[in-house]
Amino acid sequence: MKRTDYLDRLLAKFGSSFDIYMPYQIHGIEYPAFAYHYTHQEKYVLVKEANMWKADSYEYVLFVNTEVIDEAVIEKAKDIIENYFEPELVRKGEKYPAKDHMYSYLTVVIIGNHYSDSKLASKVKRYHFDKGYQFSIRGYSAGRMVAVTMDDEKVITNNAASKSKKVFKAVFDEVRANKPGFSTICEKQGVTPFKQEL
């Protein structure tokens, strides 16, 4: 299966609840796509002015398309989660996230043909990044890593991303069943992906 076909269908799944940006740059390096989701919840008594609590949740997903998943690719994914997503998108350069921040999921999805070394799959599985703010009063951030290989159609995730494994696995069958990809859906609906403001 072609990586581009897999990614196109995967973006169609994300596109139903995420804003999709194509392409997306991080520190001068261009990636095929980025997905963003935001949820705001609040509880109030009778009128909105009598607010009991508010909670904001975020998900950031970067999609990486590479022929071979090697150690450098995995290390770069870790770097993006820990040194771009968390400080720049979650905290926006501040000491803590915004007041009503509940959680942020920081995900890098690596799509490749195969690993340069089969032992690298365990590096993806073992990856862990979890950061709380003010004893979790300002919520937390969790790093999630997903690696998908075309040659053997396997999906490897770290523990934080394990619940989403079925979603990524199902894409293989959906591509074979000729389900529409993101580009086809956009064309039919006459819409285009979001553009990153640089």
PLM region spans:
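Short glycine-rich, low-complexity/disordered patches
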Residues: 20-31, 89-107, 111, 134-141
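Intrinsic-disorder-associated interaction segments
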Residues: 3-7, 70, 74, 157-164
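N-terminal, charge-rich interaction modules
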Residues: 1-68
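Exposed acidic/polar residues on beta-strands and adjacent loops within beta-sheet cores, strongest
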Residues: 49-55, 113, 118, 156
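Catalytic cores of nucleic-acid endonucleases
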Residues: 68-126
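Short, flexible beta-strand-to-coil junctions
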Residues: 56-58, 62-69, 111-115, 140, ...
